[in-house]
Amino acid sequence: MKFFALFIQRPVATTLLSLAITLCGALSFILLPVSPLPKMDYPFISVSAYMPGASPETMASSVATPLERSLGKIAGVKEMSSNSSLGNTNITLEFELSRDINGAARDVQAAINAAESLLPSGMPSRPRYYKANLSDSPIMILTLTSTNHSVGQLYDIASTYLAQKLSQVEGVSNVSVGGGSLPAVRIELNPNALFNQGVSLNDVSQAINSANAQRPTGHVDSAQQNWQVHTNDELKNADSYRSIIVHYRNGSPVRLQDVANIKDSVENTRVAGMSGGEPAIVLVIRRESGANIIATIDRIRAELPVLRESIPANIQFNIAQERSPTIRASLQEVKQSLAIAVALVILVVFLFLRSGRATLIPAIAVPVSLIGTFTAMYLCGFSLNNLSLMALTIATGFVVDDAIVVLENISRHLEAGLKPAQAALKGVREVGFTVLAMSVSLVAVFIPLVLIDELLGRMFRDFAVTLATAIGISLLISLTLTPMMCAHLLKSSPQKSQKRIRGFSKVLLKIQQGYGRSLKWVLNHTRWVLLTLIGIVVLNVWLYINIPKTLFPQQDTGRILGFVIADENSSFQSMRDKMKHFMQVINADPTVENVEGFTESSSGFMFIALKPLKERTESIEKVIIRLKGKLSNEAGAQLYLLPIQELKLGGRGGAKSIYQFALLSDDLGELRKWEPIIRKALAKLPQLTDVNSDYENKGSEIAIIYDRDLMARLGISVNEANALLSNAFGQQSISTIYLPRNQYKVVMEVAPEYTQDASSLEKMFVINAKGERIPLSYFARWQPANAPSGVYHQGLSASSTIAFNVAENYTLSDAISAIERTMTELSVPSAVRSSFAGIAQDFQKTQSSQLWVILAAIVTVYLVLGVLYESYIHPLTILSTLPSAGVGALLALELFNTPFSLIAMVGIMLLIGIVKKNAIIMVDFALEAQKSGKLSAQEAILQASLLRFRPIMMTTLSALFGALPLVLNSGDGAELRQPLGITIVGGLVMSQLLTLYTTPVVYLFFDRLRKKWHHRRTIKSQVVKSS
């Protein structure tokens, strides 16, 4: 009593307290970073190793396996997978979400050190690791083009200067450069000339190394002067290499130009970048973890004019794609929904209370509560993102509830003739406990969600804490500022209403009277209502089991990732032409704004940016279907397109479809036998589309078989023979050119015109210790064979990942069920194990955890209400409102053809907190009436239901109108917001229709049950006493 009186009697202090909350929130709002979704830093670490020329099988057995055995001992590793290809091994470690990434990185380095002694001695460098954030996509893509500069020169400028400068911009984590390689001197050997001159490849390599040798040469001192010693020991360009003497024949020098074509070129000639189908260097920029995307992009934009001034004027340096327009549009849509929600809930208050002064009170209380929440968001390290702003939008209907309950009760006393100060004090005292119970029990709903440290907890922690903070501030405001304003703004006599408002009031009165008559009938036929309630519970279970399910709504970000996979035997030139054609066709589509990408060897990928959503009539899914239709009949190459999502979960990188299904086996033969059988069976399923696999066995190889006995007689070692092949075909970097700005390689290989087919091996020879030229064909034979383009491991087992997309009109749950049935029907042997990976695996895990989280929320609310009411029974009465809300939510999702996702699950949890408010208002007043008015239970609940009908309608409509903008808004990011709004609106409508009747009936049922139990205990105690 004194607590409430303190704030009513000290209006200045109360006003300044509210002003302080508002000012702190406003300042925090300015400082909050902006991002599309909450910070989701998955602890991934990637380990890479390099051994030029080694086959995928060699890399897997000699490099990947030793590293995997050492890395597999690290604590907290959730999944370990590796990909070994020609000369490369990449191992990806996914850690548990609770694992500290920096501690994990130290353990990874220690594991690499422990495995180093087991690795091949021929590796040019130690394995390296880097921390990867797979959940974040590029924030900006830049292109570099020019008609006057070579690709190598453009790449040099981009990698040496531009990438370095852009990496220094605050908020930028990484700038990767693609579409080319650094300039290099390429030495293309003529095997016929080498044979005729008697020059081995090893002679050439040694001669070049000796001719280009930068070493310190010291200085010369005298008594008066010092001289630096400088020599012309470095060769700077192709011309300077031509005259190198590589051999002497009959006393005459054989120069490099006699046996090779030397030219200024690039390190890797089998990579190309394009923008809209034209040559370009592509810079891909990613942000630091937690950095403000919008601010980072703005800083990059501010830096670009400076960078353009520092590069040649005839180089075009442009922004191709960036994420800020979509993010800005999405957040603007949420802010608009928030503003509409605030306006709607204030309109509800005005319609019910029929007073401008009364409406002003929640019109002030709501913004104070919402703005004050920004302070907690800033202190917790949150950002302004879709989920946190959605929480504030939904909170609009919640924070006004507390003010409504207090305001409505005070208004009722004013209408009864009490003075404003007396009405304020009496009104807030009567409903203070009710407001406390409503707010605390609503916050309790999110306790299980916040405490979970897995996917659900990480994803919705911002949402839960933001909403809980808004409710907490609202509770404080409703018990302090609201009664103070009521005492000083409202008058004892009711305001005269406008005619249309009286009309609304009459309609409300008629509804209330009709409700009273129907409630009396219901209270006399409670059995049927209880049976209906049981039926609703059963219907809930049936609907949940049968409703289509997915993990996360697919967003229309306006960005598409494209993969082009050519036949393994396709040449690089053929692949580049196909890539150019694909990009030109895609770029010509009316919904496409631009397309960038690069290709390497027999594959390529593209970043496709669509026009803003307001400028196109088709969704991203329909655009993808149309583009694939245009390019599906291209011979020799296949196109895969998938929408880029703001949230990327685990799974193997580079997958060409969204969802993944992994096959594992310790028997590689069994895996190779069953993988194509399973893949073909899955490709026939109507629920799946774009089925593909990382296991390819179509690559061609030349299998060389040495005659070791003959080699021993000829004095040739296997090492020498392998060195010959490596120098000839491995594009070996044999020397380095040191220039002030960068270092450039000297690359040696047999000229491309001599390496078109296996016949080029016949031109290879080795010079033995006797100086004899011995052709490779003399001691070796070879034959064509098929070989995998990559070898994959998961854990320590061989693996293959089948990727797929969900077909139109199906959901992820449909696809998973179909795959599981197919695996059962195929009778796959136990030697081949299977499991879902990435998003599909997370979906399976969340399916089992969702029910437990919802159950934990209900139990938590029960415990809180039990403590507040000092009762085991009354919390059950209040929780009886939940089944009807669940049915309404699930039916609404079915009606809108929206699958049940994590967003919808959060909507269900919100309903747990919302719909019980009506029951709390009823039960609290019924209990008070029973205690003070000497009324029976039936009379008390009837009086409470009728007396509190107006605040129940106001709170329900406020929550409903707070969620309604999320349903109706169809702009950017609507895919995230609509499931939440649909769930809440559907649940509220059904709950409002049913709980006005079921709650009084359940209240009576438990009251009668309590009396029977008490009566039996009384009889038993009397029997005991009499005996």
From Swiss-Prot:
It holds the Pfam family ACR_tran. The keyword NAD does not apply. GO terms for cellular component: plasma membrane. The chain crosses the membrane at residues 12-32, 333-353, 360-380, 387-407, 432-452, 463-483, 528-548, 851-871, 873-893, 895-915, 951-971, 982-1002. It is found in: Cell inner membrane. It is a multi-pass membrane protein. Keywords: Cell inner membrane, Cell membrane, Membrane, Transmembrane, Transmembrane helix, Transport. The keyword Membrane applies. InterPro entries: AcrB_DN_DC_subdom, Acrflvin-R. Part of a tripartite efflux system composed of MdtA, MdtB and MdtC. MdtC forms a heteromultimer with MdtB. NCBIfam families: PRK10614.1, RND_permease_2. This is Multidrug resistance protein MdtC. It comes from Xenorhabdus bovienii (strain SS-2004). The gene is mdtC.
